[in-house]
Every structure is written in structure tokens, then in C-alpha cells.
């Protein structure tokens, strides 16, 4: 693995990790898998998945406002701007083709990357995100937007890190492995008071969320011609969310879309079932290569 500094065209700096082979060595080449984390996370969130993948090289990146990113709360967090960061990253790494995979909020960024740069993106995968967050653009119903922002506002934390691990472990079904903890550790920082808070903080978190609510995914989803796989994580009991069911049905009718519904999967399935997610991404890349060979 090689860590690199990346710069955006609007003057911000962040960090990416390039995984060249199973041993962490080897040339990058001109094609790679790019994994995009969700809101409040950072590039090491993907470590459990990357360590199990067979398809190389793989690039993980601290997206705008996250991890090592220097972007502040007043900067542009539109999905379009975040997607441009990834397109610029690919250019900086001399990548001619990428397979872009996004989890949660990262799914929206992945979708926009695929739509904005069709010549760059060989395939796209949205893991429990990208299509399911309600759109509430600025200028639309202000009450609805305010309600969504209030409902999705994260807790301020400021609690002992051991309490965070306990809460996450309970959310993961009572099991938080050392591997999971290592993947999540850079998400938090310990303040002078000895208490843990997210690195992104509340202000940047809400700025990213505002950008997400401004995004309408369906024009981009309808326009894609490359293979796109969409995973929906579902509870063990029968799915009763009518809005989500309509999203799944609409996604199933998209051209080139393959929908998977993972019963029993938690939203953070890359941590819960990293082998399954690694196999998904490997299969996406392999099938895309087969499709390209048949069409040439």
C-alpha cells in the first residue's frame, strides 16, 4: 500500500491509499477499483474489504471534508463537486478506467461520477446508498428540508472512546472485532478533555448532508449505460418501508442495473460482512471485463 497526497482543483488537499496487489506492492496500471466511504467515515473504513479482495489495484480516499481533507464547513459539498474530486483523483493517478463503488453517501458520489465521466467509469456499484436518501433541494419545501436536516443530524458525542466502541458493537449485533475497530479508529479524535468526537465534526457533517439533500439521483441513474449494481441492505423481518420498496422497484427497471437485496445485512455491511462485499466488487469487475470482451 502507498499513501499519496491528492489535491482538488479548488485548492483542497486530502489523502488516498493505493493498494497495488495482495502484498501491497506492484504497479498501479491504468485501471483500478475506487472505493468511496459514507458520511462521517474515512478511507480506512474499507480496510476489511480491501484485505479480502482479489481484484487489484484498489484506491481508497478521504473524501472532501473527511479524514485528512482540509476542506472546511463553508466549502462546496455538492455531490457534483465531490464527484469532480474523484474524477480529478483518477486523472492524477493516470487512471484511464475505474470501477467506482460507493457506500451510503458515497453511493451518491459514485453515481454522479459514473454519469459525469462515462468514458472513465467501467462500472458502478451502490451499496445501500445513492438512491435511497430523499431529495430536498434548496428552494423546495423548506419545512420538509428542515425536518430532514433535524432528523439526520448526528449526536455531538463528546464521550469516552470506550463508550463509542460499546455503542457501535451493540449496533453491529453485539460484535465489534479488532479489525472493525482499526477500520473505524481514524473516524474519531480524542480532545483535550479526553473525550471522543468525530473528526468531521457537526458543522462539516451538516454541510455534506446539505449537499446530499440537494442531489436528485434519478436523472443520473437513468442516463447510465455502464453496468451498475445496487445493493439494498434489509432487516431480517419483512421490508415495510413503502418509499424504500418503491426505490428498489424503480431501480430494478433501470437499464443495465442489477439489484441485490441482502436480508439481514446492516447498513454498514462492509464492516459486518467484508468477505461478501469483497466478493461483490470482485464479481463486478470480472463481469464488466467479460461484457467489454463480448462487445469488442
Predicted segments with their positions:
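Catalytic histidine-centered segment of alpha/beta-hydrolase-like enzymes
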Residues: 262-274
